[in-house]
Swiss-Prot record:
Biological source species: Haemophilus influenzae (strain 86-028NP)
Gene encoding the protein: ispH
Function: Catalyzes the conversion of 1-hydroxy-2-methyl-2-(E)-butenyl 4-diphosphate (HMBPP) into a mixture of isopentenyl diphosphate (IPP) and dimethylallyl diphosphate (DMAPP). Acts in the terminal step of the DOXP/MEP pathway for isoprenoid precursor biosynthesis.
Assigned EC number: 1.17.7.4
GO molecular function, one term: metal ion binding
Pathway: Isoprenoid biosynthesis; dimethylallyl diphosphate biosynthesis; dimethylallyl diphosphate from (2E)-4-hydroxy-3-methylbutenyl diphosphate: step 1/1; Isoprenoid biosynthesis; isopentenyl diphosphate biosynthesis via DXP pathway; isopentenyl diphosphate from 1-deoxy-D-xylulose 5-phosphate: step 6/6
Pfam entry (one): LYTB
Protein name, per record: 4-hydroxy-3-methylbut-2-enyl diphosphate reductase
Single GO biological process annotation from the record: isopentenyl diphosphate biosynthetic process, methylerythritol 4-phosphate pathway
Iron-sulfur is among the record's keywords: yes
PANTHER family: 4-HYDROXY-3-METHYLBUT-2-ENYL DIPHOSPHATE REDUCTASE
Catalytic-site annotation from UniProt: E126 (proton donor)
HAMAP family: IspH (MF_00191)
Length: 314
């Protein structure tokens, strides 16, 4: 069997930054460091940080007063920020700057009293944080996941409306939903370019090319990773078998029936270390050739907070 590697794949700048913030906080301040929600959606990464002294919690009520807490890459609501301030928690914010950009769009709509529509997945922490940026009682923010949800929106054609999107959605699905929104609300405003992040976009485009050459596409990523799930779905939509896996132990013999070429990619929160361990396991199943596709070079970099950056330089 032949292995073909997608390019780009794996860590994005926002994930790199978020993990660095936890690592540096542990190095400088020592354990324990509390992290609200999984800092990124990858089991391997989270377990590694937990082993070093990070304590992952879902609510700030689980964090002792005055402790250090890190907000995950997915962002938090204004209510969570206020709670941390009220309790004198020392906060390091690992929210991805591209998520923060969407937060600012929502906050702007809230200040103006403009009704906002967010395209995203209900229950995802990024969506909860983004919805929680809207505080103007005279307007409102509404969540839709798909085209069919538009029919239940309560707004009128002449309302002052704007839309934004979760950063890790399917490009195709989101384009379809935006087109349907604009058809129903011709005057609706939105970002000049949709809010789906560069890494999500690049990895989906890379999977399109990978699927054309593969009999099976393996996506390295955790089941709670939105962008990893979208990669597996995209390959399946193209008629190619796909599997989402956390690590080599997930690999099953029957995946390789009639498979000559295996495509491998990784979600934005999956480290290259996992990809290489899966390649090693595939060699035991008979994979003997490895090819890496050419792809876009990513040079995006996001700084860590100043307090940690100074220590990092020293």
């Amino acid at each position: 069997m032949k292995i073909i590697l997608a390019n780009p794949r794996g860590f994005c700048a926002g994930v790199d930054r978020a993990i660095s913030i936890v690592e540096l906080a542990l190095e400088i301040h020592g354990a324990p460091i509390y992290v609200r929600h999984e800092v990124v959606h990858n089991r391997f990464v989270v377990n590694g940080l937990r082993d070093r002294g990070a304590i992952f919690v879902e609510e700030l009520s689980e964090v002792p007063d005055g402790a250090i807490v890190i907000f995950s890459a997915h962002g938090v609501s204004q209510a969570v920020r206020q709670e941390a301030k009220d309790r004198n928690l020392k906060v390091f914010d690992a929210t991805c700057p591209l998520v923060t950009k969407v937060h600012m769009q929502v906050a702007r709509a809230s200040r103006k009293g403009t009704k906002a529509i967010l395209i995203g997945h209900k229950g995802h922490p990024e969506v909860e944080g983004t919805m929680g940026q809207y505080s103007n009682e005279d307007g409102g923010i509404f969540l839709i996941e798909k085209v069919e949800d538009i029919a239940r929106l309560p707004m009128q054609d002449n309302d002052d409306l704007t839309f934004m999107t979760q950063t890790t959605l399917s490009l195709d699905d989101t384009a379809e939903t935006i087109a349907a929104l604009k058809e129903k609300y011709p005057a609706i405003q939105g970002p000049h370019k949709n809010d789906i992040c560069y890494a999500t976009t690049n990895r989906q485009e890379a999977v399109r090319e990978l699927a054309k050459l593969s009999d099976l596409v393996l996506v390295v990523g955790s089941k709670n990773s939105s962008n990893s799930n979208r990669l597996a779905e995209l390959a399946s939509r193209m008629g190619i078998k796909s599997q989402l896996l956390d690590d080599p132990s997930d690999i099953q013999d029957d995946w390789f029936n009639d498979v000559k070429t295996i495509g491998i990619t990784a979600g934005a929160s999956a480290p290259e270390e996992l990809v290489q361990s899966i390649i090693s396991r595939l060699k035991e199943f008979g994979a003997d050739t490895i090819e890496e596709l050419q792809g876009l070079e990513e040079n995006m970099f996001f700084e860590v907070p100043k307090e940690l950056r100074i220590k990092e330089v020293n």
